Amino acid sequence: MHLSAVLNALLVSVLAAVLWKHVRLREHAAALEEEVAAGRQAPAPGPAPRADYARALQLLSEGGTHMVCTGRTHTDRVCRFKWLCYSNEAEEFIFFHGNASVMLPNLGSRRFQPALLDLSTVEDHNTQYFNFVELPAAALRFLPKPVFVPDVALVANRFNPDNLMHVFHDDLLPLFYTLRQFPGLAHEARLFFMEGWSEGAHFDLYKLLSPKQPLLRAQLKTLGRLLCFSHAFVGLSKVTTWYQYGFVQPQGPKANILVSGNEIRQFARFMMEKLNVSQAGAPLGEEYILVFSRTQNRLILNEAELLLALAQEFQMKTVTVSLEDQAFADVVRLVSNASMLVSVHGAQLVTALFLPRGATVVELFPYAVNPDHYTPYKTLATLPGMDLQYVAWRNMMPENTVTHPERPWDQGGIAHLDRAEQARILQSREVPRHLCCRNPEWLFRIYQDTKVDIPSLIQTVRRVVKGRPGPRKQKWTVGLYPGKVREARCQASVQGASEARLTVSWQIPWNLKYLKVREVKYEVWLQEQGENTYVPYILALQNHTFTENIKPFTTYLVWVRCIFNKTLLGPFADVLVCNT
């Protein structure tokens, strides 16, 4: 075949691919335009009767924008708007002041210190702030004709849609529970992502959260110059997040984690249903250990040897899985039935949230990377109610690592640094604590390839996993707390001028008779009125007579509460005032 013929054939195929992509993009844009075309006639969402365009414009022009928010500060605020608008030309939201406008909280200039709210769940990040420009409603006469979006909108930012850990932790989980925070929102809302990213590698996962196609900021320009939302919710609940990435202080678990494994597992169940993944029985017909395999970086250099050793030690099949080569639904199917998940530290480990109860997570750390400094997956695995076992293994042998100093800086290369800094990094035995996100020593070490020392890994795993690893049925493990003790009362008796007795009694919390509890104890605090200190007692019975240091003709304050299984502390009953 002549070279010219080959080139012509190649050119035709490339041109056909380009034209096909162009046609698909045009079809997608046309579909979006058709969806909002009705917005020029009928802005009201949901089952309510649809007002005509003139009525919608009148409501906006006369009444203006309406805003009511929950949360006290910009880091925990979610706001509900009526008639919030967005200018595609200015790329800003607009609050129109009319005769029915409400703005709660009405912060004045404090709205800019630093913002009304965070659009993403990464707290107080200066690229994630939301605010709006204020205009009188009369200014609508001089602006482009508004297009009314017919959907209830949930407006937010994705933080890093190309990283699976960020996708789940920062976006999907918070979106899932924010949609359920307000009645009907999960079934009505369309997601509007305003951060400016393209769809990214995991956009199909976002589509699972709502029956309506999510829209990106770039797509809004095809819909009109001025968009107005009859109903919009702005911001995300952060209550499901468990980790901070080190923008202000070195990364680590959040100081006040408010989510448990119960909420994580309910979200995982929803995602599995949407992905059409069944957890009924192992897909391979038997129990197995699953090892994440990577092909570009952070390689396990002796992967085959590792698979064989794990199979021999635990007497079960070992299987590899790869996000690079397999569909995400297939990955979830394998993870959700695995007895053990083994992986080098990386975003793929967030899939541990799909593991069955009783499974084990084994996280491998390259040379010079301290497992105690990087714990997003340990924190996830050890949340109350996740019921997972967690093992961290660290390569302590420099001869078992392969580094890549020649790579680009964002893949761990250090050739761009001066020679002294390169030498320091090469000689370092541990990456010091650091802030996010471009620390060259951290990147150099985390992108190493590792030959796993099999005996030390097996020994490390066996410290945690004593028997055969594997899923197991477990009873409800998230603790149920006692209520208040009931009918607390006290009775005193005086014996002479210097001795007295104080008897305190109470009834069990009313919810105790409906619960199976291994151990019930009671905590009593005894304080002489006017003193700053109290004496605590742990008691097994529902009454007790106190004699030590009880004075006659003295007032005592007494608090009583119930404790289940040593750790589940109930509320104190109302204070008893006891006179001897």
Swiss-Prot record:
GO terms for biological process: neuron migration; protein O-linked glycosylation; protein O-linked mannosylation. It comes from the Eukaryota. Residues 26-580 are lumenal. Pathway: Protein modification; protein glycosylation. Glycans are attached at residues 99, 276. InterPro entries: FN3_dom (IPR003961), FN3_sf (IPR036116), Glyco_transf_61_cat (IPR049625), Glycosyltransferase_61 (IPR007657), Ig-like_fold (IPR013783). Its main location: endoplasmic reticulum. It is a single-pass type II membrane protein. The chain crosses the membrane at residues 5-25. Its EC number is 2.4.1.312. It catalyses: 3-O-(alpha-D-mannosyl)-L-threonyl-[protein] + UDP-N-acetyl-alpha-D-glucosamine = 3-O-(N-acetyl-beta-D-glucosaminyl-(1->4)-alpha-D-mannosyl)-L-threonyl-[protein] + UDP + H(+). One of its GO terms (molecular function) is acetylglucosaminyltransferase activity. GO terms for cellular component: endoplasmic reticulum; endoplasmic reticulum membrane. It is found in: Endoplasmic reticulum membrane. Residues 1-4 are cytoplasmic. Keywords: Endoplasmic reticulum, Glycoprotein, Glycosyltransferase, Membrane, Signal-anchor, Transferase, Transmembrane, Transmembrane helix. Residues 488-580 form the Fibronectin type-III domain. It is an enzyme of class 2 (transferase). Belongs to the glycosyltransferase 61 family. O-linked mannose beta-1,4-N-acetylglucosaminyltransferase that transfers UDP-N-acetyl-D-glucosamine to the 4-position of the mannose to generate N-acetyl-D-glucosamine-beta-1,4-O-D-mannosylprotein. Involved in the biosynthesis of the phosphorylated O-mannosyl trisaccharide (N-acetylgalactosamine-beta-3-N-acetylglucosamine-beta-4-(phosphate-6-)mannose), a carbohydrate structure present in alpha-dystroglycan (DAG1), which is required for binding laminin G-like domain-containing extracellular proteins with high affinity. This is Protein O-linked-mannose beta-1,4-N-acetylglucosaminyltransferase 2. The gene is POMGNT2.
